Design a protein with these regions (language model features):
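Interfacial/gating helices of multi-pass transporter permease domains
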Residues: 1-17, 85-92, 154
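Small-residue-enriched core segments of transmembrane alpha-helices in multipass membrane transport
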Residues: 14-15, 129-136
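Alpha-helical transmembrane segments of multi-pass membrane proteins
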Residues: 17-19, 85-111, 138
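Short runs within selected transmembrane alpha-helices of multi-pass transporters and secretion channels
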Residues: 24-27, 98-117, 123-132, 152-168
Length: 183
């Protein structure tokens, strides 16, 4: 699709990566708290820490998504200086798609950190592989064929939405403690 398309999508993905890195740091703070509580047999603390972390991570990502949506031109303009270019247009489109997908990415990340903290490494690996593998790779082939260059801009955001939905259902299916009242 050309250099402009690649530049626009790359800039959007890197901006999202910075926001996601903050979320990863937050999740890394959650994991030892949850793991310690689980190891000590403090089920109510595991429940509370998961619930608190999931809610605050989703709220944080909603806030970041709203800010990204509102200031998309300014954020992308820091890296792309020509407003009418294909790169700027695709960066804005991709950033808006990321803005919608941010809460879903939070669900996926916190779910993966939760399973890792519990020592359920197979489940943690499965959840972690959803974003960049299981959901992402098929969408790389499907979305550009359906939507052309716009499909390229939507791939990562669509993968995050799918991964977040699958993570939420998997969390509930595996008898997660998130939606039970604390003891």
């Amino acid at each position: 699709y050309g250099d402009g398309a690649m530049a626009g999508v790359t800039v959007a993905n890197k901006i999202f990566a910075v926001i996601f890195a903050v979320l990863v740091g937050y999740g890394q703070g959650f994991a030892p708290v949850c793991g310690f509580a689980y190891g000590a047999g403090l089920e109510s603390r595991v429940k509370r820490s998961l619930r608190f972390t999931m809610i605050t991570a989703v709220i944080f990502m909603c806030a970041m998504g709203a800010a990204t949506w509102v200031w998309v031109s300014e954020v992308a303009g820091v890296f792309l200086h020509e407003g009418g270019t294909q790169a700027m247009q695709l960066a804005a489109l991709s950033l808006r798609a990321h803005a919608i997908s941010m809460p879903f990415a939070a669900v996926c990340l916190v779910t993966g950190m939760y399973y890792q903290a519990l020592g359920a490494y197979g489940k943690a690996t499965l959840i972690s592989a959803l974003r960049q593998g299981v959901c992402f790779i098929p969408l790389v082939f499907i979305l550009p064929r359906m939507y052309g260059v716009d499909g390229v801009a939507f791939v990562q955001a669509a993968a995050d939405v799918l991964a977040g939905i699958v993570s939420a259902f998997y969390l509930l299916y595996t008898n997660c403690l998130l939606y039970t009242s604390p003891s």
